[in-house]
């Protein structure tokens, strides 16, 4: 028996699930190391996801090998903790890997020189590299023959090249090897990450998936995938995130989807899947979505459009994914009666305030949900390269006064990621700030449906675009409209959805205590004061319907009410492309609202997993019933 075993610390701070990359690496180590090598190592610390526990483990076990799995959300925490470790243990073995580690030779060498406490950086896929690094550490500590790493030899950085693992079938599954058993005994993750393939054939400028060494799609065995899905069902994991870059690009992906449905039927879990669907494989994707929708695993289709601006699409490598392409996708999804959400990006090269507002308006025209991502420069992407940044004059928050907390407070913004794009040649910083704030308004009044139907009416009856209405609302003096002002300036442009109850923010009074009557009364006065619109029955009907479909705590449901004009049919006809008749041409209607998620009966904030939209609007003829689930109410969870 070996005394004084070397502790191996598997560290992924700020993580809400079993660390997938580290799990693959540790499982592969245990599978591949010789028994005498395993005997020298102590893996008993398991997976460490918070800094306090890391320090406790170090106090108990002391110096060792520290594996940091580094992402955008934990790079700063990892740097701080690893510096403390190196200061305490000069001979600690600090290994950094993960997507935030640069793979370009020049950048990798610069990174390790700037962070001399790091002993080895693993570039790209880490299973083989970490295995060989630990073997060398246990023997002669010579790393020059190990591919996919950067390290310091003497005083000089050494880059050993980069490739990918051709045969992924040799890799051990952390789920099937029992790697996460102890993790699940302590934590209750709502989600796990699975992969059925690796690689991406596309090369989008903002993404590091399709780099030249990773463009070949490599498949894991179906039997392994099926067994992992069985593990998910047996362990009652609510959500599966499939990390495949293009689910549906392979015909066999339909089989995977069918098996997920079968697992849910058998165990009641998972409740939902999150996936990146293939861009150019309509038939497979439609079949997958159709099957998973029927099983209650998806409630919406998500299209990662980024933008419809043709020049920007050309620059970022997506010129073939134009408006016509997405219109076809919309038709297919609508044929499945499936709500559609699009993902947009603010801060892409050659984009302007006009092009961004045009993207938002396109979503409104087709009644689409919207999720806006702020462009962040991550390593190993084309957009992060120095020549690319110089060409398009890309500036990040760290390079501007938007890194100053006091200035952000002064202009009404919350802290911004230091790597977030805040200006380019085509969009000044002031314009960017305006678009961030417009995004916040859009999320609140359109995304949460608070003014969705009112704005739809104004656009179709009075030619006031939704984006123009919100732009006006952003800049107009609202001192006479305190309820509107409160919601307009509530704050965070990155907060896409609003908790229904239990929210200690400016929506509390409106949602929790039913402030809708005061709010919509102000909305009417605001519209009449700022636009050439008569105070007629059509406008009042739309305002009444808008208020009627909004939820609030304690409301008695279901509820039914008669209205003078059939707004649901009017809305359906226009969104569906039928002739644009005026609302006055539609007769009476009765609208019934229901609360399938019991939102109005909750006295505390529900913990919902349902991305890309809020829950304030209730179910009715206007709003397709989209399922969700409260993680706190799942039996045995």
Question: Where are the regions that the model predicts?
Answer:
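A general structural detector for well-ordered alpha-helical segments in enzyme core domains, enriched
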Residues: 25, 54, 77, 81-85, ...
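Short hydrophobic segments within beta-strands
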Residues: 9-13, 69, 97, 243
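Radical SAM [4Fe-4S] cluster-binding motif and immediate context
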Residues: 36, 169, 173-335, 346
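A structural motif corresponding to the C-terminal lobe/cap of the Radical SAM core domain
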Residues: 6, 62, 118, 219-220, ...
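Short, charged N-terminal beta->alpha structural module
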Residues: 19-32
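Glycine-rich beta-alpha loop elements in corrinoid/cobalamin-binding modules
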Residues: 37-164
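Radical SAM enzyme core and accessory elements
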Residues: 1-11, 31, 37-40, 55-64, ...
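A short, glycine/small-residue-rich beta-strand->loop->alpha-helix junction that serves as a flexible
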Residues: 14-21, 70-75
């Amino acid at each position: 028996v070996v005394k004084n075993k070397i502790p191996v610390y598997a560290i992924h701070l700020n993580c809400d699930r079993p660390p997938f990359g580290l799990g693959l690496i540790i499982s592969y180590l245990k599978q591949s190391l010789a028994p005498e090598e395993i005997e020298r190592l102590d893996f008993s610390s398991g997976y460490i996801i918070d800094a306090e526990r890391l320090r406790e483990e170090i106090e108990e076990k002391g110096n060792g090998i520290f594996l940091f799995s580094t992402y955008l959300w934990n790079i700063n925490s990892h740097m701080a903790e690893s510096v403390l470790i190196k200061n305490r243990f000069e001979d600690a073995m600090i290994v950094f890997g993960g997507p935030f580690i640069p793979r370009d030779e020049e950048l990798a060498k610069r990174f390790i020189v700037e962070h001399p406490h790091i002993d080895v950086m693993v570039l790209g896929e880490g299973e083989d590299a970490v295995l060989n690094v630990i073997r060398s550490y246990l023997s002669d500590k010579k790393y020059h023959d190990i591919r996919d790493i950067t390290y310091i030899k003497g005083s000089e950085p050494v880059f050993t090249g980069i490739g990918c693992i051709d045969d992924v079938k040799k890799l051990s599954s952390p789920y099937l090897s029992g790697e996460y058993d102890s993790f699940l005994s302590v934590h209750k993750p709502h989600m796990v990450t699975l992969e059925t393939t690796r690689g991406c054939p596309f090369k989008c400028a903002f993404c590091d998936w399709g780099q030249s060494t990773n463009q070949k799609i490599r498949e894991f065995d179906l039997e392994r995938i099926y067994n992992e899905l069985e593990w998910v069902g047996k362990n009652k994991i609510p959500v599966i995130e499939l990390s495949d870059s293009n689910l549906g690009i392979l015909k066999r992906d339909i089989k995977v989807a069918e098996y997920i449905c079968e697992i849910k039927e058998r165990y009641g879990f998972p409740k939902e899947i999150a996936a990146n669907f293939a861009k150019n494989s309509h038939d497979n994707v439609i079949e997958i979505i159709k099957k998973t929708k029927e099983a209650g695993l998806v409630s919406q289709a998500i299209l990662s459009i980024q933008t419809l601006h043709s020049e920007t699409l050309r620059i970022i490598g997506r010129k073939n994914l134009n408006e016509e392409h997405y219109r076809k996708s919309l038709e297919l999804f609508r044929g499945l009666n499936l709500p559609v959400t699009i993902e947009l990006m603010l801060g892409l090269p050659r984009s302007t305030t006009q092009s961004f507002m045009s993207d938002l308006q396109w979503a409104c025209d087709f009644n689409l949900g919207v999720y806006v991502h702020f462009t962040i420069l991550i390593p190993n992407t084309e957009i992060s390269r120095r020549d690319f940044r110089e060409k398009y004059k890309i500036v990040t928050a760290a390079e501007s006064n938007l890194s100053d907390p006091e200035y952000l407070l002064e202009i009404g913004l919350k802290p911004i990621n230091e790597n977030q794009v805040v200006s380019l040649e085509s969009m000044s910083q002031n314009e960017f700030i305006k678009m961030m704030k417009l995004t916040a308004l859009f999320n609140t009044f359109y995304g949460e449906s608070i003014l969705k139907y009112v704005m739809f009416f104004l656009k179709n009856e009075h030619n006031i675009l939704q984006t123009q209405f919100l732009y006006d609302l952003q800049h107009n003096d609202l001192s006479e409209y305190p309820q509107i002002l409160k919601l307009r300036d509530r704050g965070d442009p990155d907060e896409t959805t609003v908790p229904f109850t239990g929210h200690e923010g400016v929506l509390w009074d409106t949602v929790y205590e039913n402030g809708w009557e005061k709010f919509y009364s102000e909305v009417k006065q605001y519209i009449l004061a700022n636009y050439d619109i008569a105070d007629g029955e059509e406008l009042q009907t739309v305002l009444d319907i808008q208020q009627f479909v909004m939820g609030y705590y304690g409301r008695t449901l279901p509820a039914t009410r008669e209205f003078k004009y059939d707004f649901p049919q009017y809305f359906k006809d226009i969104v569906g492309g039928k002739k644009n008749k005026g609302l006055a041409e539609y007769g009476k209607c009765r609208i019934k609202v229901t609360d399938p998620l019991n939102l109005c009966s909750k006295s505390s904030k529900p913990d919902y997993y349902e991305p890309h939209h809020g829950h304030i609007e209730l179910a009715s003829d206007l709003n397709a019933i989209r399922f969700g689930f409260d993680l706190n109410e799942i039996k045995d969870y």
